[in-house]
């Protein structure tokens, strides 16, 4: 099973995302804040939750590899949809339903 890295601007959201994945059987999960953005491994599925400075985040993600799932609040989602699609990033709307998160992770792994 692939490694999963969660980078979150909110510790409580990051822990909730990790719990959803653990409950579904995923085990190789690391949790960090957004400062770990420079260390995204090529072979990991990276889940990122951000609520501020989205433009700079998208600029940084353009150089990253691997599978990226980006979770955004409604006020940012629509503005970044086309850009994320062009960059090959899966974009999900917060609050994300557990089944949607799990489907996105499974699709990124396969």
Q: Which residues does each PLM region occupy?
A:
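Two-component/phosphorelay signaling modules centered on CheY-like receiver
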Residues: 11-32
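Short amphipathic alpha-helix used as the core "switch/output" element in two-component signaling
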Residues: 55-64
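Alpha4 helix (beta4-alpha4-beta5 surface) of REC/receiver domains from two-component response regulators
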Residues: 74-91
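C-terminal output helix
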Residues: 96-105
